[in-house]
Amino acid sequence: LALAAAQVASSSASPPLIELLTFGVGSDPFSHFGHAGICLRELGLPGGQCMNFGTADFSTPVPLTLGFLRGEAAFWVSVLDRGRTIDWYAAENRTVERQILPLSNAEAAALLSALIAAAAPEMRYYRYHHFNDNCTTRIRDLLDQAIGGRLSATTKTTSSGKTFRAFIEEGFKDHVLLLALSHLFIGRAADRPASEWEAMFLPSAFRDSVERIMGARPETLFHSSRIDVPARVPTGHLAILSYGTIAAFLISVSRTKRYGAWLRALLVAVPGLLGLGAGLIALYAIQEELVWNEALLVITPLEVLALRTDRLGRWWRRGRVGLFAVIALLGAGGVLLQPLWSSLIAMTLILGALEIARSPKAQRA
């Protein structure tokens, strides 16, 4: 790489081919948003090397996740053989696209120098952030610097037309449980609109912006057989609503069953534990999108109070439903940003069923 940079710096040398590779989504959660790499090839020759800014120790998911929550997840850049890189992603049945970057000699030299510096032992590690500092934004920033800010000049002030949460929902569209959990665990910072520049944390958005601004058309090197179904139905919200409806029904009929008390406790424990999890994440994490979570107004570890049969339990159930009405009004007025409607309806159904089951008339029955 250093030799190539020195050659390009001279006016008589032809720059190497610099390619942006975009890899499609995979089957595991770490690959739901795709991936990007940047490769160097000598003109007219096979082979080449790729730089991967998304290298991490994925064999230890628990420490990696805890590090992510604290903003301490260590990622690094690795240099790999181009052919082996493409073959690996093809074997994973992930689409591979390339864009040859139309760079002048000076721009190619600047980009090569920046890539070499980024791969140096003292610079190769960085603290990963899904939106702000990932495998794609690292390449985006180096490329933008090399071409004199042409990528950022217009995209930083142009809206992508979507929020960060919308991008998350697209990435998790095939996984109902992850979608439902994202509604409960990811906070209000994800509901602000993303600029086109910010949207380039996604490899596909970066690919599209590079094509539009630099004229680098994507070429498909491998096409995945995976069927891409557009996300039209809010399945995460439907999952939350389904749980609330089923739980309310079971609570309504459980008062005549022998183990009704245990069943009611179990059904109420689920949102309580989810609230506990969301609260612990908010306390432990440092990322803004995980700390300020409006869903904690709807699900809390104190939901077990709704099981009480005394005055405190009655006040809790009725007070919570009243609070839900206020939350709905604040959401409609734009004060609260998160899409809380499914959890509000689900918890209202559950607390309403408990209130009916705990009424004196129902107890006598």
Q: Residue spans of the language-model regions?
A:
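Glycine-rich catalytic cores of cysteine/serine-nucleophile enzymes that process amide/ester linkages
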Residues: 14-95
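Second-shell loop/turn segments in exported
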Residues: 26-27, 93-102, 121-130
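A structural motif
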Residues: 103-116
